[in-house]
Amino acid sequence: MFPIDFCHIPVSIIKRSAGRSAVAAAAYRSGTKLTNEWDGMIHDYTRKGGIVHAEIMLPAHAPPEFADRSILWNSVEQIEKARDRQLAREIEAALPRELSGEQQLALVRAYAVSYTHLRAHETRSN
């Protein structure tokens, strides 16, 4: 394995009270155009460069239609109706340059599975 001299992984919460939108964040991170059905705003980041990979990973029990980014994040926006709701968590990570693109992707996927599994257990008080 490669030595990692520095690990920086900030986690932030996307919440309406801070003027943020899960749909807007998803559009920005994926470099796509999405319309937020909650407030009617169109978020177009199709000209944004630097998107190496965008993927939605769903648990086995999730409805298959949530593989569509617009359906997934608009569903979150619709379910969480109050202005003070936390809509999503955003995790940024500096990946080791020594790893290939495939290795970086595998690392991120493993982290996502591990993180969501841990969060599910915290939520259920297990």
Language model features: what each stretch is:
Residues 1-125:
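N-terminal nicking endonuclease/strand-transfer module with a His-rich metal-binding environment
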